[in-house]
Swiss-Prot record:
Biological process terms in GO annotation: 'de novo' IMP biosynthetic process; adenine biosynthetic process
GO cellular component: cytosol
Organism of this sequence: Rhizobium rhizogenes (strain K84 / ATCC BAA-868)
Statement: the UniProt record of this protein carries the keyword Repressor: no
Full protein name: Phosphoribosylformylglycinamidine cyclo-ligase
Catalysed reaction equations from the record: 2-formamido-N(1)-(5-O-phospho-beta-D-ribosyl)acetamidine + ATP = 5-amino-1-(5-phospho-beta-D-ribosyl)imidazole + ADP + phosphate + H(+)
Keywords linked to the UniProt accession: ATP-binding, Cytoplasm, Ligase, Nucleotide-binding, Purine biosynthesis
Pathway stated in the Swiss-Prot or TrEMBL entry: Purine metabolism; IMP biosynthesis via de novo pathway; 5-amino-1-(5-phospho-D-ribosyl)imidazole from N(2)-formyl-N(1)-(5-phospho-D-ribosyl)glycinamide: step 2/2
Length: 357
């Protein structure tokens, strides 16, 4: 218990525990060190994180930056008291946005805000961030922990992430040669990833299931644990395929808004993506969400990834080469569709077939 000093109140009396913050820093140092890479080998604790771009091996780089959060998936982590994986989600949401532009993630910074700092909880979260950074090959070079009593309810917290990467000038994606007839490949997701969780939570509430109840769609797992499956990080397989095949014309990260909102972002205005919905292998979690919530297929497709977390556009003659390169790195690939002509004012994504929910 804190005590007021002779001259009145202390910061601790106001709800901010500096000692807890210092303890958290000591707890996370080994995890942070584990993310070191060429260009970043400093310790945390300075006023700013350092990165040596020349040491990373670039000659004429263009920097690419992205920031994101985890959204209301955090509420499940908080309610289920399971904090080990949301840091992976945080990194994934940022670095996947970098790689779609052909950039290699270099470094990452996080912002962790809470009403009352729990060093063990914070260490679990940052441990997940470090795990995500290792998987993406980027260094965790700094961050901010903000204890803000009165801003958040007890136990609540929020996360934001910031990633910076680089690509050699002239190698950024999308390329300028996307053409009618090019093939769209879909890379499988690991689950819901980090979008649509306000709807997920509404459906779970309607189901009457508790977070520790057996997941109806994942044998041997509790509902909360299954829904917290971390977002897949596609960085290393995609970078390897980009560099080995020189055949990937465009990539799109399928996040909030699904196919119709994300694929057109990387396409020229005169082309649309024709998606064959029968090619999508819908994971059981999405079937359960659709049936339990009575969610129509159209709404599922504009809210969730529905089993495809990333798409790649390649020329038809390069499909086998790119698929082989990605499958060699453990990715599950489907031929999802093709590029077609698009009339002015028409939708950038059109469907054929139906989604097997």
């Amino acid at each position: 218990m804190s005590q007021s000093g002779k001259n009145g109140l202390t910061y601790s009396d106001a709800g901010v525990d500096i000692d807890a913050g210092n303890l958290l820093v000591e707890k996370i140092k080994p995890a942070v060190r584990s993310t070191r890479r060429p260009g970043a080998d400093g310790e945390i604790g300075g006023f700013g994180g350092l990165f040596d771009l020349k040491a990373a091996g670039f000659t004429d780089p263009v920097l690419v930056a992205a920031n994101d959060g985890v959204g209301t998936k955090l509420k499940i982590a908080i309610d289920a008291d399971y904090h080990d994986t949301v840091g992976i989600d945080l990194v994934a949401m940022c670095v996947n946005d970098l790689v779609v532009q052909g950039a290699e993630p270099l470094f990452f910074l996080d912002y962790f805000a809470t009403g009352k700092l729990d060093p063990d909880q914070g260490a679990a979260i940052v441990g997940g961030i470090a795990a995500g950074c290792r998987e993406a090959g980027c260094a965790l070079i700094g961050g901010e922990t903000a204890e803000m009593p009165g801003m958040y309810s007890d136990g609540d917290y929020d996360l934001a992430g910031f990633a910076v990467g680089a690509a050699e000038r002239g190698q950024l994606l999308p390329s300028g040669d996307i053409a009618e007839g090019d093939v769209i490949l879909g890379l499988a997701s690991s689950g819901v990833h980090s979008n649509g969780f306000s709807l997920v939570r509404k459906i779970v509430d309607l189901s009457g299931l508790a977070w520790d109840a057996p997941a109806p769609f994942a044998e041997g797992k509790a509902l909360g644990e299954a829904l917290l499956t971390p977002t897949r990080i596609y960085v290393k397989p995609l970078l390897k395929a980009i560099r080995e095949t020189h055949a990937i014309k465009a990539l799109a990260h399928i996040t909030g808004g699904g196919f119709p909102e994300n694929i057109p972002r990387v396409l020229p205005k005169h082309l649309a993506a024709e998606i064959d919905l029968t090619a999508v292998k819908v994971p059981p979690v999405f079937s359960w969400l659709a049936k339990t919530g009575g969610v129509e297929a159209k709404e599922m497709l504009r809210t969730f990834n529905c089993g495809i977390g990333m798409i790649a556009v390649v020329a038809a003659e390069n499909v086998d080469t790119v698929k082989a390169a990605l499958e060699a790195e453990g990715e599950s690939i489907v031929t999802l569709g093709r590029m077609i002509a698009r009339d002015e004012g028409a939708a950038g994504t059109v469907y054929k077939g139906t989604l097997d929910l």
